[in-house]
């Protein structure tokens, strides 16, 4: 147990891929391979070359300064995006009770005295049912050896099953340090937490462990300190004022999709994709146009709603988050279109930005 863990005084409210729990099959998502230089400006990359590929392009390298990447992995709905947001201090990754909410790799940078952490939110590892699911799984598994620490998240409220075991087999073969993170401790009682910890240790060995509750902000700082302990010495990979590597267009698409998921729930979630078509900043307002894509005409009707009421509410919900993120008034225009079978069309998957190699 991590030395950083605090006592929790409140009530703690299926070999092959085919063996994954039916629940896991429904609840899922993936992650993507990334290049730590991807978000750097041309000037920063040029500086690296000018310095004979030394670390000087990052500015002064502080003696003893530590930095690195931490992947948040686990079954769908294990609480990865919620923990990412809690670590960052504000919402950068979308969340919902719907399976497969996370589709894009999302990185959030956390700066603390003496170190910089780059958290990578990944899609839930699951049994894929279509081309999109396969890409998401590839993406998540690629991540395991490209980071310094793998945080394996397990939901404290759900019995550990063969789905967790399948994920654990992949995690334990990674070269990275492994930290067990038991999430949603506020929804479990103490006996349930202890039983989950015991079951988790039967899956694999860990370098450390911690019990958390993101919604109660319980042990979030302790989790950050726990994973930071395993970081190697190195430079700041990203500027101190950079919070996420996601583009404005990506943020728009993701937050609109989140509102669709929350408003429609189980009716059409896996068939929804969103593309931000245009962003135009004027003196007083940010004008945004985005298109919501579904696979069938019936799904389009659900999103539009009777008299346009559903699309209206989706737009209002999304606009509120976008105004908070961009710090300006937002005029959001939404369209809904049908793109049949897009989840099994590689070209369309790439168009939506969900392929593992991007």
Q: Which residues does each predicted region cover?
A:
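Conserved C-terminal guanine-recognition region of P-loop GTPase G domains, centered on the G4
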Residues: 110-116, 135-209, 263, 280-285
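Conserved G1/Walker A P-loop phosphate-binding module
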Residues: 3-22, 26-149, 154, 292
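Catalytic P-loop NTPase motifs of RecA-like helicase/translocase cores
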Residues: 102, 125-127, 159-160, 188-189, ...
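Canonical P-loop GTPase G-domain recognition
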Residues: 177, 186-248
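Conserved, well-folded catalytic cores of nucleic-acid-processing
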Residues: 90, 109-113, 143-150, 203-206, ...
